[in-house]
Amino acid sequence: MARITVEDCLKQIPNRFELALAATYRARQLAQGHTPKIESRDKPTVVALREIAAGQVGVEMLKKVPA
């Protein structure tokens, strides 16, 4: 099983703070029942990071957050 690292995700979202926000927001979505964009049996936080590293989700999801 391949391990996910922050460095893999930083290639997609270079700002660590935006990366943390995007991963948190996506992990919450997954925990609430949204469909994952990649196939994985991992916890929502790991799936969120895998999606970011794969380029499936990115910083654009922060612009969708309702105010």
UniProtKB/Swiss-Prot annotation:
- Is the keyword Transferase assigned to this protein? yes
| A GO molecular-function annotation | DNA binding
Pfam families, from UniProt?
A: RNA_pol_Rpb6
Q: Which UniProt keywords apply?
A: DNA-directed RNA polymerase, Nucleotidyltransferase, Transcription, Transferase
Q: What sort of enzyme, by top EC class, is this?
A: transferase
The record's Gene Ontology cellular component field reads: DNA-directed RNA polymerase complex
A Gene Ontology biological process in which this protein takes part is: DNA-templated transcription
Question: In which family does this protein belong, per the annotation?
Answer: Belongs to the RNA polymerase subunit omega family.
Summarize the subunit comment: The RNAP catalytic core consists of 2 alpha, 1 beta, 1 beta' and 1 omega subunit. When a sigma factor is associated with the core the holoenzyme is formed, which can initiate transcription.
Q: What does this protein do?
A: Promotes RNA polymerase assembly. Latches the N- and C-terminal regions of the beta' subunit thereby facilitating its interaction with the beta and alpha subunits.
The protein here is known as DNA-directed RNA polymerase subunit omega
According to its UniProt entry, this protein's organism is: Burkholderia mallei (strain ATCC 23344)
